[in-house]
């Protein structure tokens, strides 16, 4: 299934692939590649799940949270912000690359504070997905539909106060970057051996594209879309493709020192059904940012996120522009 015809001529789709690693750099970069690698985005809006949640779930009644040590041990000030990592996420590094502030969790801001921010918002919610019911067994979370609704709320209630005319607001949105990292939890919670793989994928793609279309109607034009990673032998497959994709001179400096490419850095607190995360205030491996790809069984260390950003933007080996 392709993009709705009304979108094809307007969207810049940037795929960060953790599976199909391919080099897109050429001696004559396309206009789209120039936008990606040399762009000057005024704002960065993030929609997604736990890979990029900066703390929205801290403000929701849910079991899926990361607002306690050892999460955040290497973040600024050693604070557990709600990020499912020892430090920064890939969304943080994208913001840094484009010289933007780290994008704040929407639910963690007062209305007055939201009125003052025009450099982006993060609506990502750990455990949630494309389907409305995904992750709800663990409590409340923000589905794809809800996150898009919150972006619409951002425009109507907050962004309009920052721009003198509707034209200025439209230009702001048209030149901003929108990241989506969502879909793997739909498989984790709902996919079984009895599920028809093609039908399930078609359903998710249809729902996803409907929300992309809504974002487009609201003014979004440039998208950074993260591919869904595989389930099953998750750590082994991701680690293998991670090492294959990060073979440039810069990433080799870091990857050559990795001691554990599949195991988590922190002791686990496994509830048997919903999620596996770090035990509260547990001791982690001594140097997660030099030895491990995974901080817990499903989420990368700050080092891994940093290496992804280098491979995407500097070495240009894992990002593909279409």
UniProtKB/Swiss-Prot annotation:
Active site (record annotation): 50 (nucleophile), 296, 299
Keywords: Glycoprotein, Hydrolase, Lipid degradation, Lipid metabolism, Secreted, Signal
Signal peptide range in chain numbering: 1-26
Enzyme class: hydrolase
EC numbers, comma separated: 3.1.1.-
Biological processes annotated in GO: lipid catabolic process
Glycosylated residues, chain numbering: 260
Subcellular location: Secreted
Pfam family, one: Lipase_GDSL
Molecular function GO terms recorded: hydrolase activity, acting on ester bonds
GO cellular component: extracellular region
Family, similarity comment: Belongs to the 'GDSL' lipolytic enzyme family.
Record's protein name: GDSL esterase/lipase At2g04020
Organism in which the protein naturally occurs: Arabidopsis thaliana (Mouse-ear cress)
Lineage of origin: Eukaryota, Viridiplantae, Streptophyta, Embryophyta, Tracheophyta
